[in-house]
From Swiss-Prot:
GO terms for cellular component: cytoplasm
Highest taxon above the source species: Bacteria
Family: Belongs to the MurCDEF family.
Record's subcellular location: Cytoplasm
Source organism: Legionella pneumophila (strain Lens)
Binding site for ATP: G122, T123, H124, G125, K126, T127, T128
Pfam families recorded: Mur_ligase, Mur_ligase_C, Mur_ligase_M
Keyword annotations from UniProtKB, A to Z: ATP-binding, Cell cycle, Cell division, Cell shape, Cell wall biogenesis/degradation, Cytoplasm, Ligase, Nucleotide-binding, Peptidoglycan synthesis
Reactions performed catalytically: UDP-N-acetyl-alpha-D-muramate + L-alanine + ATP = UDP-N-acetyl-alpha-D-muramoyl-L-alanine + ADP + phosphate + H(+)
Role according to the record: Cell wall formation.
Name of this chain's protein: UDP-N-acetylmuramate--L-alanine ligase
């Protein structure tokens, strides 16, 4: 199509006004923004003010603070975040009024239905890979729409309505809602144990659900999967769709060779299937895991006909994603200056990948790791893996578990986690938001790097730490 022409998807029947319950969530706000830009009247509600809520209001979207039945007035459909309980007064009122109530993923699937959908799935790396794919397609002139679970730094948003039919989305396995999607192309970055309550504690069920997701592709679609992941290799023979692989292994269709890390700069060569030539890639995102994320995006971009120069340039220009190994700056503490890095990682494997990237970027610096565990269920089910991963920090400051709406589980505490790490002759300090600054003043030496990591409120703490010093 001519990129000067706006791709128009059919309207959703009689739907004019759409209400989002939990509109401030990472998965909700982007969908709301895209629908707003398509001309629908959007309203929403959330529990509190946030930067996301303020941004939505700046676009002209009505956002209410608090959940009340009158908030849904005029709505033709109500979209529910997975974090919202069915007893929510707005959900109850909508059902009584016979207004359709649908999950977030169902609306995302509807947005994708008439587009060329590209869905990025996997336990780790979804947000970064979705951002990379969106950036490379944009650099190549394809002008995609996208909905991402994090803020793309280059545009300061996690969603955009492009002119073309291409639609890049982050596909969420946490509640198995990615099964709503029927994309044309799909990436699976890895399969790891997380959100196991969704899968009744059965890893085989998790594995087969990812396979089912790939089989939502049409017979002429394309699966792009990581050959470095053991669980993907296990399902690979069962994938009954055209498939390309990526990784460091010689048999991968898209292969990285000669990878070097020079500070924040990753440099490597990509070997691609004939007739495509090799590409030398440089981008400012450290770590082996991010080389793999880049490979996935290169595979998608190449298969969609993005020219080589645009791929190379797009990766060079990539400015990253909010809260993914994000350097906030350097700040002075009582005993010296330290760099502050903010990161969303909340799973042991993500901690390991981040620490590995840290050691490659700053091999001579000391890592002061401030970690906020996220969810009691995750902390309980992955207790041993958390102990192993967190023991690799030079100094560990551990915060209380961020509940994320869960009920506390007896015996599952940060103190218990700390005690087991201490049994390995590692120093662990329990800190609160109130005591964090004073503790850092005591601990920090000149040249240290502070890693503020977790999926809860710690991201805002990192921002506040930079502002208030």
């Amino acid at each position: 199509m001519n990129n000067s022409e706006q791709f128009l998807s059919p309207r959703m029947g009689r739907v004019e006004q759409i209400h989002f319950v939990g509109i401030g969530g990472a998965g909700m706000c982007g969908i709301a923004e895209v629908l707003h830009n398509q001309g629908y009247r959007i309203t929403g509600s959330d529990l509190g003010e946030s930067g996301t809520v303020q941004r939505l209001r700046s676009l002209g979207i009505q956002v209410y603070i608090g959940h009340r039945l009158e908030n849904i007035k005029g709505a033709d459909v109500v979209v529910r975040s997975s974090a919202v309980d069915f007893n929510n007064p707005e959900i109850v009122a909508a059902r009584e009024l016979m207004i359709p109530v649908i999950p977030r993923a169902a609306m995302l699937a509807e947005l994708m239905r008439f587009r060329h959908g590209i869905a990025i799935a996997g336990t780790h790396g979804k947000t970064t890979t979705t951002s990379l794919v969106s950036s490379l397609l944009a650099e190549g002139g394809l002008d995609p729409s996208f909905v991402i679970g994090g803020k793309l730094n280059s545009c300061g948003a996690n969603a955009q309505l492009g002119k073309s039919a291409y639609f890049v989305v982050e596909a969420d396995e946490s509640d198995a809602s990615f099964l709503f999607l029927k994309p044309m192309m799909a990436v699976v970055t890895n399969i790891d144990a997380d959100h196991m309550d969704t899968y009744e504690g059965d890893f085989e069920k998790l594995r087969t659900t990812f396979l089912e997701f790939l089989h939502h592709l049409p017979f002429y679609g394309l699966a792009v999967v990581c050959l470095e992941d053991e669980e993907i290799c296990r399902i690979l023979p069962a994938i009954q769709r055209p498939t390309l692989t990526y990784g460091f292994k010689e048999e991968a269709h898209y292969r990285a060779i000669n990878w070097t890390q020079k500070g924040m700069l990753s440099e490597f060569v990509v070997v691609r299937p004939a007739p495509h030539k090799q590409l030398t890639i440089q981008f400012q995102y450290p770590g082996r895991h991010n080389v793999l994320n880049a490979l996935a995006s290169i595979a998608i971009a190449t298969e969609l006909g993005v020219d080589d120069d645009s791929i190379v340039r797009g990766l060079q220009k990539f400015q990253g994603v909010g809260r993914r190994f994000q350097m906030l700056g350097e700040k002075q503490f009582e005993k010296g200056a330290a760099i502050i890095v903010d990161d969303y990682g909340h799973h042991p494997q993500e901690i390991l990948s981040t620490i590995d990237a840290f050691r490659r970027v700053w091999p001579e610096r000391r890592l002061v790791h401030v970690f906020q565990p996220h969810r009691y269920t995750r902390t309980q089910s992955l207790h041993r893996q958390f102990v192993d991963a967190l023991s690799l920090s030079d100094e560990l400051l551990l915060m209380d578990i961020y509940a994320a709406g869960e009920t506390a589980i007896p015996g599952v505490t940060s103190e218990n986690l700390a005690n087991e790490i201490r049994s390995r002759d590692k120093r662990v300090t329990i800190v609160s938001e109130q005591s964090l600054k004073a503790t850092l003043d005591e601990f920090i030496k000149d040249g240290d790097v502070i890693l503020m990591q977790g999926a809860g409120s710690i991201g805002q703490m990192a921002v506040n730490l930079m502002k208030n010093m």
